[in-house]
Amino acid sequence: ACLVGSEMCIRDRYDVGNSAYTLLACALIPIWYKSLAVGDGAGQISSDRATAYYAMAIAVMTVVSALIGPVCGAIADHMRIKKAIFSTTVVVGVSACILNGFTPTWVLFLVIYVLTKIFYNASLVFYDSMLVDVTTKDRMDEVSSYGYAWGYLGSCVPFLVSLAAYICGPDMLGYISNRLSMIIGFAVTGIWWLVVTIPLFKSYKQVNYVSDAADKDIHKNFENDAFIRDNIKEKNKTNKNPGVLRLIADAFAQIFGTIKKIATKDKKVGLFLVAFFLYIDGVGTIIDNCINIGTDLKLDSVGQVVFLLFTQIVACIGSLVFGRLSQTYKTTTLLYVCIAGYFAVCLYALTLHDLIGFGIMAFGVGCFQGSLQALSRSYFSKIIPPENSGEYFGIYDIFAKGASFLGSLVIASVKLAGGTINVAVATMAIFFAVGFVFLRLADRYDAPRHENN
């Protein structure tokens, strides 16, 4: 385990901070948004339209985050300014989070929510890539797992404050309770997010980065590409600060080159990313639809939140257990166990008919949720070049952002065909099965020279 005060433990505190916002976004933000958007008042809309606009906002956020993540990561790797950019994304994200509680209209609420999520997601690119700087490869699994564990547990603290304001507010504050609960929820979460991150601001040092010699080789290779060379020259002619433009253009060019390298040479990384996309899509879809299952079982919103907190606590324990097991077993072995566990959870969904069964399913999800995410992060850290960790995690983040995309389409198709939500969730077993196969292929593939797993 991380020693208190060590840089590894300090790094893990950001999991505690950002997870608080994740939990708020999952449980309460949709409720607050609907309270502003739905109704017969001026500027308000129907519930269906509100849901559609919310989905559109999430789509915009996902696309923007996927585009800027790799670029920012590549720039940070080359300019050795990972901490500076990370700090900026956190401060802007926290500020937007707190401001979100004071928004008077649902339109402004959505705009600021999207802004918060974009900077939140950008911060995760840099945070995940810091793993290669704060620990050795033989401890990455443990450190990553402990980060997720404390994140699940620590996020409950500000969330319980927000939940208390939301539930108890009507009895104590009457008409203004919902507005005040929003202000309290966003403010407490934002302050928590920032305060627990301050030690990381102070202590983190970027150890791995692209050397000047490697940077020159990259530039030389880019100059051999006529399209990239001509595009950069043309833009530099019309820009008063060609250095900045050149940096951005080179970042895009490098990302293109890295993707090409992954597809043609670094196939271990490529196969893992395919596996990750499939099984993490299944994870995201199940999480998203647990609430729908609870609704079908006549579980009210408070009961659903209670089960959500229960899952968080179980996920904390599961991450700690798998973190300890990582000292004895290979990362891929533990990933196989987690994927198989989720496969079983999907099939178990077919038998759900009461709240006891729903609780068992929530327990199963919690056991493997954090562990699968943490071990995926640490395994990826081991098989990529550490000096390009920011850029690679930007690409990793694109695959993570796709979580629940394909699964949601499958869920919708099954429901439209007349199937139950139980059957729809059970179909997610296919994603875990195919993801398992691709992970096996990645595990057997020759490791790149930078891996030491």
Report each predicted region and the residues it spans:
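Multi-pass alpha-helical transporter architecture, strongest
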Residues: 192-203, 426-453
